[in-house]
């Protein structure tokens, strides 16, 4: 901010008045032709000021929108003369009369574009320094600068709309669950640290020095205990905390809609969840979603889409061609554990640079490279075409339905690398060719998840979801004898390739829970120390129960059509889990540490 601008702002402070007995009659986004002739009082921020033909025009903004207000000497000489001091982001209250805009001046892009308010008197409620960026949707400032001045960023109309939408979604959720006799119950934020998840955020106890609380990664155990307590139907819109490395769509603290029900099976939980999504979409976007949602087994999702959260808005599929290429002259194909192909109709138009970019993209997912073949009218164009026999070409043509003008991408490696790299490449290719229809919402239940997954880091099987998920009937013995084949009574709700919810039917007996802990390699004493209170509850008449949790932030992001989850969180953290506005996390005073019985080691000692 220049010294001149600072001097102007400080000089204008002398014009600031108190609100007094003025009361707002309308918001800045609601006036229309029906209000013509009305006397109104509006309050908000100066968006723009324009001097034109002896008149001063101000776009006055609040969270509801903009109204054009006019300072005319024909209405009030005093109000007009004083209006010359107004600058962007000054806080203003105006009284005046609603008039129709002159012919040819109607703005159809504004809710209030038919009218304007001629000001008879006004008050300057506060001044503003020159803001570090213009408060408008077409902002050019960096995201870091906008996060530093987040309260300014939140004045932008698009973000204001996001939080109005979030509020409507929250209200729709509460109203729907209330009608189904759910109870909203709060669970503790200060709780016990337990294994089998991401890292916990730990909170030292002053009264019990040397001991720590953990902030909850989810209210999972507490909501199960509420079912044991006979609450029957519980929900909570709750903050959760995970100390994990952050991706672009993750935050260390996030909001989930947490739901649990007694005396239910998978179908009943899913039916409730479908009705909830239908209510939210109807009340926020006015969209009727088709019910029931389709189901897809986990194995099919991985086989055909490469991911357990397939985007079904477009129809590119992966095909297993391992057997076709087992004897291939191309050594990588012949020796690979898994070879998959993805045909892209019309994809032969891709340039070599675009293919090279795709090759670099799949390396992020562990791939060593990306094989490809362009199907031309007279030849197969590819560095690997010479290694393929006529029989292999014929088999690939039949299996993949190849036609002239197509391109085929191949991946040959371990199943994890093949599925992840081609699964995410599928999304990239769909974006490149415009295959994803706009304003479409495809829900999908993914079911029959593995109960366990092998962790190379821990060199053991860990729970795919959490250790309280019930195995499918008849899979109890597989938990120990062949854990890779054990399937869970778990289900995820996917929307346009995004996981928006996940749940399961829970274990509800001590014997079955102990069996799960044994399968996970828990020492009995360790299990008792960590989860003894839960297992004790399971001995005291626990009903069959299950539930689901929705990621509120991601759901609202999709409703808003936003590219970033940070656009629907009021005060988000960066990918380094820092707050650029408050500078959290921060050092604390030595006195506070002494009261907690904590002493920091020097960095070189650590």
Swiss-Prot record:
Keywords: Aminoacyl-tRNA synthetase, ATP-binding, Cytoplasm, Ligase, Nucleotide-binding, Protein biosynthesis. One of its GO terms (cellular component) is cytoplasm. ATP binds at residues 242-244, 251, 499, 551-554. GO terms for biological process: aspartyl-tRNA aminoacylation. It holds the Pfam family GAD. InterPro entries: Aa-tRNA-synt_II, aa-tRNA-synth_II, aa-tRNA-synth_II/BPL/LPL, Asp-tRNA-ligase_1, Asp-tRNA-ligase_1_N, Asp/Asn-tRNA-synth_IIb, AspRS_core, GAD-like_sf. It catalyses: tRNA(Asx) + L-aspartate + ATP = L-aspartyl-tRNA(Asx) + AMP + diphosphate. Signal peptide: none annotated. The keyword DNA repair does not apply. The record marks 52, 104 as: Important for tRNA non-discrimination. Aspartyl-tRNA synthetase with relaxed tRNA specificity since it is able to aspartylate not only its cognate tRNA(Asp) but also tRNA(Asn). Reaction proceeds in two steps: L-aspartate is first activated by ATP to form Asp-AMP and then transferred to the acceptor end of tRNA(Asp/Asn). Homodimer. Belongs to the class-II aminoacyl-tRNA synthetase family. Type 1 subfamily. This is Aspartate--tRNA(Asp/Asn) ligase. The gene is aspS.
């Amino acid at each position: 901010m220049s010294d001149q601008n600072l001097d102007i702002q400080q000089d204008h402070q002398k014009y600031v008045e108190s609100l007094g007995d003025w009361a707002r009659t309308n918001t800045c986004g609601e006036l229309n032709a029906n209000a013509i002739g009305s006397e109104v009082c509006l309050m908000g921020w100066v968006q723009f000021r324009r001097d034109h033909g002896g008149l001063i025009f101000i776009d006055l903004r609040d969270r509801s929108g903009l109204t054009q207000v006019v300072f005319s000497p024909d209405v009030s000489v005093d109000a007009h003369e004083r209006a010359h001091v107004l600058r962007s982001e000054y806080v203003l209250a105006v009284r005046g009369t609603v008039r129709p805009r002159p012919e040819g001046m109607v703005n159809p892009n504004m809710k209030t574009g038919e009218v304007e308010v001629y000001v008879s008197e006004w008050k300057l409620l506060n001044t503003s320094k020159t803001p570090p960026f213009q408060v408008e949707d077409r902002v050019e400032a960096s995201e870091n600068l906008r996060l530093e001045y987040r309260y300014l960023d939140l004045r932008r109309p698009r973000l204001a709309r996001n939080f109005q939408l979030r509020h409507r979604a929250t209200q729709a959720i509460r109203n729907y669950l209330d009608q189904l006799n759910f109870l909203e119950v709060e669970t503790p934020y200060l709780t016990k640290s337990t294994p089998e998840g991401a890292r916990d955020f730990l909170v030292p106890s002053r009264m019990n020095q040397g001991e720590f609380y953990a902030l909850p990664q989810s209210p999972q155990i507490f909501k199960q205990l509420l079912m044991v307590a006979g609450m029957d139907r519980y929900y909570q819109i709750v903050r959760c905390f995970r100390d994990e490395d952050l991706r672009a769509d993750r935050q260390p603290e996030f909001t989930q809609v947490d739901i649990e029900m007694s005396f239910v099976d998978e179908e009943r939980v899913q039916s409730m969840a479908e009705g909830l999504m239908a209510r939210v979409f109807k009340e926020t976007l006015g969209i009727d979603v088709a019910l029931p949602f389709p189901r897809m087994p986990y194995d099919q999702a991985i086989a055909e889409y490469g991911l357990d959260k397939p985007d079904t808005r477009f129809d590119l599929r992966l095909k297993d061609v391992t057997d076709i290429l087992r004897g291939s002259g191309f050594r990588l194909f012949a020796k690979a554990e898994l070879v998959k192909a993805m045909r892209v109709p019309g994809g032969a138009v891709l340039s070599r640079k675009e293919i090279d970019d795709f090759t670099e993209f799949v390396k992020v997912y562990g791939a060593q490279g990306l094989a490809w073949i362009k199907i031309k009218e007279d030849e197969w164009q590819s560095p690997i075409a010479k290694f393929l026999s006529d029989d292999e070409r014929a088999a690939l043509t039949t299996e993949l339905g190849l036609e002239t003008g197509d391109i085929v991408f191949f991946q040959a490696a371990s199943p994890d690398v093949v599925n992840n790299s081609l699964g995410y490449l599928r999304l990239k290719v769909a974006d490149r060719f415009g295959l994803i229809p706009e304003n479409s919402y495809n829900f999908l239940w993914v079911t029959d998840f593995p109960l366990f997954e092998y962790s190379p880091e821990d060199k053991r099987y860990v729970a795919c979801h959490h250790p309280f998920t019930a195995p499918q009937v008849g899979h109890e013995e597989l938990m120990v004898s062949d854990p890779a084949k054990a399937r869970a009574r778990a289900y995820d709700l996917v929307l346009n390739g995004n996981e928006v919810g996940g749940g399961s039917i829970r274990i509800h007996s001590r014997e079955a829970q102990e069996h799960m802990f044994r399968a996970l390699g828990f020492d009995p004493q360790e299990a008792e120390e960590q989860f003894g209170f839960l297992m004790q509850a399971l001995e005291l008449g626990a009903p069959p129960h299950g539930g689901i949790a929705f990621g509120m932030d991601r759901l609202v992001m999709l409703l808003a059509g936003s590219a970033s989850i940070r656009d629907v969180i009021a005060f988000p953290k960066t990918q380094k889990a820092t707050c650029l506005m408050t500078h959290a996390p921060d050092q604390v005073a030595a006195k506070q540490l002494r009261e907690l019985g904590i002493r920091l080691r020097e960095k070189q000692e650590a």
